[in-house]
Amino acid sequence: MSEASRVCSGYYSLNHSFVEPFQCPRRGEGATLLYCCGFADLKYCCSEPGSYFPYKHSYMWSLSIGALIGLGIAALVLLAFVISVCVLCYLFLYTKPQRLDTGLKLQHLEAVSTQEGNSNRKSKAPRSNAASNSTNETFYEADDIIQEKTMDTTQINTAYC
C-alpha cells in the first residue's frame, strides 16, 4: 500500500475552517479504514479506495426503495391512462348507432327540385272522383313533357340572343 493513499491532505470545510492533514486510520477508528476518501471539503478514512460517500450502502438502498416506489406509482398511473384511452376509443368506434335504411334513394339536386315542382302541381290539380288513376297519371305525364319542351325552347332562344 502506498503511503500517499493513507494521508488525507488539509482542506477547508463547509464552514470555512481549515482541517489539518491526517493519516488513516485515525485514533479510535477501525484498523480497516486505511484509505483517504471524500471530497475537497469533506475528507475521511474509509476501507475502499475511491469511495466518495461517508454513509453505509444501506442508506443508498433506502433512497433506491423510495425511488422505486415512486416510479412504480407513476407507471401504474400511466398504465391506467393508456387503458382508459383504449377503452374510450373502443366505445367510440364500436358503439355508434347503426345507420337505418330508410328505403329512400339518393337523388341529384336537379331531380329533387323537378320532383318538388311536380308534386306542387299535382296537389293543385283538381281531382275527379269519376276519373281513374291511369287518366290522372297520363294527364301529369303530358304536362311534364310540355314543361320540358318549353324549357328547351327557352334555352335555345337565350343561346341565340
UniProtKB/Swiss-Prot annotation:
Keywords for this protein: Membrane, Transmembrane, Transmembrane helix
Entry-linked Pfam families: Shisa_N (PF13908)
Protein name: Protein shisa-like-2B
Top-level taxon of the source organism: Eukaryota
Membrane topology: Single-pass membrane protein
Membrane-spanning intervals of the chain: 65-85
Main location: membrane
Membrane keyword on record: yes
Protein family according to the UniProt entry: Belongs to the shisa family.
PANTHER family: PROTEIN SHISA-LIKE-2B, SHISA
Subcellular location: Membrane
Residues making up the signal peptide according to the UniProt record: none
Any one of the GO CC terms: membrane
InterPro entries per record: Shisa, Shisa_N
Record region (Disordered): 115-134
